Amino acid sequence: MVIRITWGRLRAGAWSEFERTYRAKFSEGKTVKGLRGRLLVQDTADKDAGFAMSLWENLADLETYEQSELYQEVMATLQPFFVGEYKTYRCEVKCTDLVS
């Protein structure tokens, strides 16, 4: 299992609009092969920054998604919200203890 974690800073005061757009765009991708779930989290100390995380069955499924038309459409929609740098990490999940 792998997790994709992206940190980014948004335009000042744009979080609510970004979150609405994120929810709308990613609701289209719920059936992406290998996708186990997503989280969007806002920094408690800096309301204009946060993380988007997605959990994947394997790296191949994640890479296929990152090359897809859906991913390109989503990124084109979300990119205007970002200012400055954003960074993405791909990590292998070593331990899980999720409670529903």
Residue ranges and their predicted role:
Residues M1-G50, E57-Q67, F81-S100:
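Short S/T/G/P-rich N-terminal loop/turn motif that feeds into the first structured element of a domain
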Residues Q72-V74:
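A common structural junction motif
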